[in-house]
Structures are given as structure tokens and as C-alpha cells.
Amino acid sequence: MARNEIRPLVKLRSTAGTGYTYITRKNRRNDPDRITLRKYDPVVRRHVDFREER
């Protein structure tokens, strides 16, 4: 029960507009705001920013 409250699953959607997503867990205590990670988007074949989607 406590596991889902502290570290929920979040979707990271590509800012390149391809619709590609990653799914990861996030620690709400360390990152209360929306997270942005730079990851690989295979559709455009380059690294782009992925933002948390709610």
C-alpha cells in the first residue's frame, strides 16, 4: 500500500511529438514537480526531452 503512494508509476512522453513513451517510477519526496529526462526516442533516432504526463 505505501509503495504506490511514495513511488507511483509515471509516463514520460516525448517532446518531439512522436507519441513515444517510457514508463518509470518516481520518488515524490525528491521530485514533487513534473520530471524531465533526456532519453532516446527511436522514432526520430535521437535523444530528446521526455516530460512527465499526468
Swiss-Prot record:
The Gene Ontology CC terms held by the record are:
cytosolic large ribosomal subunit
Among InterPro entries, the record links this protein to: Ribosomal_bL33 (IPR001705), Ribosomal_bL33_CS (IPR018264), Ribosomal_bL33_sf (IPR038584), Ribosomal_zn-bd (IPR011332)
Q: Name one GO biological process term.
A: translation
Q: List UniProt keywords, sorted A-Z.
A: Ribonucleoprotein, Ribosomal protein
Entry GO MF terms: structural constituent of ribosome
- Protease in keyword set: no
Top-rank lineage group of the source organism: Bacteria
HAMAP family per the record?
Ribosomal_bL33 (MF_00294)
Q: Which family does it belong to?
A: Belongs to the bacterial ribosomal protein bL33 family.
Identification of the protein by name: Large ribosomal subunit protein bL33B
Name of the gene encoding the protein in the UniProt record: rpmG2
